[in-house]
């Protein structure tokens, strides 16, 4: 009997907590894509997305990976413009 009462109270508590938090999260989920786009415009938010690139006339090697390292995207032993 005590276990049944405890289970009923626990279910009521969890149901009430779902209804309390659901009202607050409704607006947050709708605005989530807008917030992410807004954060990407901030330089501090996108520090991890920035990559260093090699300037022109800098040695980059002779592979396809070297072209990815150059700021211009052209690599023939050195970065080209």
From Swiss-Prot:
Propeptide intervals in chain numbering: 23-51
Disulfide bonds listed in the record: 53-71, 60-75, 70-79
Tissue: Expressed by the venom duct.
Domain of life: Eukaryota
Signal peptide from the UniProt entry: 1-22
Cited SUPFAM superfamilies: omega toxin-like
Keywords attached to this entry: Calcium channel impairing toxin, Cleavage on pair of basic residues, Disulfide bond, Ion channel impairing toxin, Knottin, Neurotoxin, Presynaptic neurotoxin, Secreted, Signal, Toxin, Voltage-gated calcium channel impairing toxin
Function summary: Omega-conotoxins act at presynaptic membranes, they bind and block voltage-gated calcium channels (Cav).
InterPro entries: Conotoxin, Conotoxin_omega-typ_CS
Cellular component GO terms, alphabetical: extracellular region; host cell presynaptic membrane
A matching Pfam family: Conotoxin
Molecular-function GO terms, alphabetical: calcium channel regulator activity; ion channel inhibitor activity; toxin activity
Family according to the record: Belongs to the conotoxin O1 superfamily.
Origin organism lineage: Eukaryota, Metazoa, Spiralia, Lophotrochozoa, Mollusca
Compartmental location: Secreted
The protein's name: Omega-conotoxin-like 3
Transmembrane portions of the chain: none
């Amino acid at each position: 009997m005590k276990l049944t009462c405890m289970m009923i109270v626990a279910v009521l508590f969890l149901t009430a907590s779902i209804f309390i938090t659901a009202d607050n999260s409704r607006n947050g989920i709708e605005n989530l894509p807008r917030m992410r786009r807004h954060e990407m415009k901030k330089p501090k938010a996108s520090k991890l997305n920035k990559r260093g690139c090699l300037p022109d006339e800098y040695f980059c090697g002779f592979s396809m990976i070297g072209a990815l390292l150059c700021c211009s995207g052209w690599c023939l032993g050195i970065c080209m413009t």
